[in-house]
Design a protein with these regions (language model features):
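Ser/Thr/Asn(+Pro)-rich, low-complexity disordered segments
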Residues: 61-524
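Boundary at the C-terminal end of the N-terminal hydrophobic targeting segment
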Residues: 17-19
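Extracellular carbohydrate-recognition regions
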Residues: 23-33, 37-45
Length: 524
């Protein structure tokens, strides 16, 4: 199935995603995001109706060495046990003893951090130290034939792996020598991966190290840079090696100087940037914009050219924008505005998911450095996430964000519709969304994590599984590298008074960028 066909099928019939491997579905999902990516003018309807397609999204890169290796073992299915054997560990049981879980917030989050770290350590390729993208267990046992390993990895997952190693050191789960050794092993593998113009490709096979994508992603590249920044702040002996990798990545590569926005990425086989741009400010991509500004690769004007709210004429919006007026911040003209829902005022994200809203807060203390803009917005998004789930959806729990789908072996984009410009639909609740809220509403989030574990069979040997249907109680018995790493890093920040955020802020790139975000006020 082509990515274009899969993307269209998933728009019309979400169950179609179950027919594709996770990494193919993720590429298709990214394609859909590009298809719907807006400019400040109301282009969304034109792009959908006109059927404009990102040409590069239809290509597939076949890992030739990997296919030959599988063939030598009797084919893809026959190779599965060998792939599993490459992992550093495997859970012995499907579920943890619910009655043995701690009953106080701090003790529970500490247990979650320990268990999640054990999972992050287990689900890496032992030879190459790369995290595998996902591990999906069966519904009856942890070790059954139903289990599947997605032995490919994404640049964001590598960046978060670096941050997670630092977090494990901060928590005392590994000593400094072990942590440095783990980072060195990962950096050695990075040195063996194919790159282009200083950047890594978006996907690699963890068994053969072949790239499996033609795309170089702006936002994913920025998370690798963030990981390197945290590492060089934590471990002076690795400073020079991390700095070399950081400095060779010039983010002008993604910058459209005419629009003053970052492209979604670059298609190497087409020698062309993506047609689409990150136009919405309040999205996970904002961290990459700040890194690019802090490095001096793009001007700070870029920050003020991203959309806070779309014009009222954009009828497809989930809510009409309020108080949309021109203003000046740090000498830059911009148009502000906000949405309002049941007394809560906020700048929307694109889909209304917790991932878009709070992933940057893993490394960036927005409440401290941008209290009247990003910090206040983070708090509003958590409040609406909670209230919308409980009051509008009738869920007993909250936390909506892209995650596995409990009903089938697929992936869905979930969010709170009124929190997004377009807004994703509601669906499964995912623990990583609640964990991200630990840095914004710690008491509420910690209590909710305990509630999830007490109410549903969603806590395994390596911490929370990826998602639960709050209506049926059905669980997606999957561990996703991205979601598990976000959960662990958020828990580590909670337990160490934001140590990862402090490491990031201490880096000179971050220090230069922080001045850009301090003056703006989202809601007057």
């Amino acid at each position: 199935m082509s990515l274009r066909l899969l993307a269209v099928a998933c728009l019309l019939y979400p169950g179609a995603a179950a027919a594709a491997p996770v990494h193919v579905w993720t590429e298709a999902r990214d394609f859909v995001a590009r298809l719907f990516s807006p400019a400040e003018s109301c282009e969304l309807g034109e792009k959908v109706v006109g059927g404009r397609v990102e040409p590069g999204a239809q290509t597939v890169v076949v890992p030739v060495k990997k296919r030959a290796w599988e063939a030598s073992l009797g084919g893809e299915e026959a190779a599965r046990p060998y792939i599993r054997a490459r992992l550093a560990g495997w859970p012995a049981r499907l579920l943890a003893d619910r009655d043995a879980l701690p009953r106080t917030d701090t003790e529970f989050v500490a247990r979650l951090a320990r268990d999640s770290w054990r999972g992050l350590e287990a689900f890496i390729d032992r030879e190459h130290q790369l995290p595998v993208d996902n591990v999906r267990l069966g519904v009856a046992s942890a070790g059954g034939d139903e289990a599947r390993v997605g032995d490919y990895t994404n640049v964001t997952s590598i960046g978060l792996r670096l941050i997670a190693i630092v977090a494990a050191r901060e928590l005392g789960l590994v000593d400094e020598q072990d942590a440095v050794g783990r980072v060195r092993g990962l950096l050695d593998t990075l040195g063996r991966l194919e790159t282009y113009d200083g950047f890594f490709f978006n996907w690699y096979d963890t068994t053969s190290l072949e790239r499996t994508s033609n795309f170089i992603s702006f936002v994913d590249s920025s998370w690798l840079t963030a990981g390197l920044m945290v590492v060089r702040s934590a471990f002076p002996e690795l400073h020079d090696e991390c700095t070399r990798l950081i400095e060779r990545s010039d983010y002008r590569f993604f910058y459209d100087a005419d629009r003053q926005r970052m492209s979604h990425g670059y298609w190497v086989h087409l020698a062309a940037r993506s047609h689409y741009h990150y136009g919405v400010l309040y999205a996970e991509s904002r961290l990459g914009s700040l890194i690019a500004i802090g490095k001096g690769d793009v001007p700070e004007e870029h920050w003020f050219r991203m959309v806070r709210t779309f014009p009222p004429a954009c009828r497809w919006q989930s809510l009409p924008p309020q108080a949309r007026a021109r203003k000046t911040v740090r000498g830059h003209a911009l148009v502000g505005g906000w949405y309002e829902w049941k007394g809560e005022r906020y700048v929307p994200s694109w889909g209304g998911s917790m991932f878009e809203a709070l992933m940057p807060t893993l490394v960036l203390d927005e409440a401290r450095y941008a209290p009247r803009s990003l910090g206040a917005n983070d708090a509003a998004h958590v409040a609406v996430q909670r209230r919308y789930a409980l009051e509008e959806l009738g869920y007993p729990v909250w936390g909506l964000s892209p995650s596995s789908t409990p009903a089938n072996d697929a992936y869905g984009e979930y969010g709170v519709r009124v929190l997004g410009s377009l807004g994703y639909g509601a669906g499964a609740v995912t623990p990583h969304a609640v964990a991200l809220a630990l840095g914004v509403a710690p008491a509420e989030a910690a209590a909710e994590l305990r509630q999830l574990a007490a109410r549903y069979d969603v806590y395994g040997e390596y911490g929370f599984y990826d998602a639960v249907d709050p209506r049926s109680g059905q669980v997606a018995h999957a561990y996703l590298a991205l979601d598990q790493a976000m959960t662990f890093i958020a828990a580590a920040n909670y337990l160490t008074d934001g140590s990862i955020r402090r490491r990031f802020a201490a880096d000179p790139i971050a220090a230069r960028a922080l001045a850009v975000i301090g003056e703006e006020r989202f809601v007057d």
